[in-house]
Amino acid sequence: MEMSKFLESRREALKLLGAAPFVAAVASAQQSGPGQGRGGRGRGATHFEGPPTPSPTAIPGGKPLLTLYSISLQWADYDEAAATAAEAGWHAIGWTVRGGGHVLPENVARDLPKAVAAAKKAGLQVPIIITPIRDAEVQYAETYLDTMSKLGLRYYQAPPLGQYDYAKDLQPQLDIWKPRIEALEKLNEKYGTTAVYHTEGGAGNIGGGGWDLWLAIKDFDPKYIGMDIGLGHCTMKGGPEVWELIRFTHKSVLSIACNDIRWVKKTDPPKGPRRSDPSQDWPWTAEYVIPGTGMVNFRDHFAYLKSIGYAGSILHYSEYFVDVQGASQPISILRPNVPKDMPKDLYVSNVERDREFYARMLAEAGF
């Protein structure tokens, strides 16, 4: 049966995930000598600090960059979007460089420099851009990478690898991507750029749980191919302790996308957007919520990122809804029409609160 093959592959991955902290601890003990192994941490259980090798994004003494995803600023031009992000205290902005985004694919050579200049004018960095490039055959792919290289940009978010066909064997559906990813790796090597594939939750998405995405990319050089771990999306797939996935995939984790979710009964009154489920009669579903009010274990995620020297982007990806006075229904914080649907000061106060939450979690993690 196809599902049994899928579950067998997943079990193998999870066995490795479970072994990873132990392997890291043994390696550390061998390096340190008797009695000098790495200590544990956490509440009620031992949490090994993980492998001592820094992540590829590590900057000596550096900290993760709190980065606002510009999809929530589509109502503003480059200058206003960057100024608004800075007003809310963000360190950086992740421009949408795709259809319907701030920079359109056909205009990337002309307009991406303008967007980067606007960010710099506002005192923001641009550690990552969001693109449609999942392989080397995507239209304008080489123009994207050439422009990024000239601007000194390294990382771009790549979209998920499509949808599973559950009527067919699943492993070949991962394997078919490997030559395409290899071609993109070579293109990235040419331009000094790096693709980070996003773990998009939801039924049927290839790579949505993280473990299967890692199986697709694990043999590629993390200088050029990596993962953008969506903490909320992976929690949606695996529960609050799925953060331990990062322990096994740490060399490939080059970007972190943050949102928060909780599991709710479908009969509960909705407080935010919900994901569809593979089984429509299943009573539980996932709902997006304000960061810090859901199931995502930000504390332990960030503590582990600290232990591996992570200094990449923390990309704010929240998809919760906001109550607006006079509105007939809550408004999405992900795609608000400001000021028509939501006053600008209300938008700013929400994303500022979110930034303060992430900053507090990073501080508690020792950053």
Please provide the spans of the model-predicted regions.
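Alpha-helix-loop-beta-strand connector modules within alpha/beta enzyme cores
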Residues: 112-127, 184
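Active-site beta-loop-alpha junctions enriched in small/polar residues
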Residues: 71-73, 98-100, 131-134, 161, ...
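Active-site mouth loops of central-metabolism enzymes
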Residues: 66-76, 130-138, 171
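Active-site acidic/histidine proton-transfer and metal-coordination neighborhood
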Residues: 17-18, 22-25, 80-82, 125, ...
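Histidine-acidic metal/acid-base catalytic patches
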Residues: 2-8, 12-33, 40, 44-67, ...
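Catalytic domains of carbohydrate-active enzymes, especially glycoside hydrolases
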Residues: 81-98, 151-152
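Glycine-rich, proline-tolerant flexible connector loops at the mouths of alpha/beta enzymes
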Residues: 96-114
